[in-house]
Curated annotation (Swiss-Prot):
Entry keywords, A to Z: Iron
Keyword Iron among UniProt keywords: yes
Family from the record: Belongs to the Fe(2+)-trafficking protein family.
Gene3D superfamilies in UniProt: Fe(II) trafficking protein YggX
Protein name per UniProt: Probable Fe(2+)-trafficking protein
SUPFAM superfamilies to which the protein is assigned, alphabetical: YggX-like
GO cellular component: cytosol
Parts forming coiled coils: none
Secretion signal span: none
Keyword Magnesium: no
Length: 91
């Protein structure tokens, strides 16, 4: 049976993650408070941040930046958008 969490991002009850997706306290907080649906949305946003900002994930500063963005995305004011980002218009 799937775990249910009250998702901090989506503000509704939804299926929880199967395991902590990130190490440490932040990973546990995400596991306890973020749904699978919200995590999938973060992965898309994270991919955009990596690509648009040309982040090298071998660089510790890039990983720290992504960790800060992840915490802000789920529990803060929201993650940054890349410079010049224009959201797609619904069709």
């Amino acid at each position: 049976m799937a775990r249910t969490v009250h998702c901090a991002l989506l503000k509704k009850d939804a299926d929880g993650l199967d395991f902590a997706p990130y190490p440490g306290e932040l990973g546990q907080r995400i596991f306890d408070n973020v749904s699978k649906e919200a995590w999938a949305q973060w992965l898309k946003h994270q991919t955009m941040l990596v690509n648009e900002n040309r982040l090298n994930l071998a660089d510790a500063r890039a990983r720290q930046y992504l960790a800060r963005q992840m915490e802000n995305y789920f529990f803060g004011a929201g993650a940054e958008q890349p410079a010049g980002y224009v959201p797609p218009t619904p069709t």
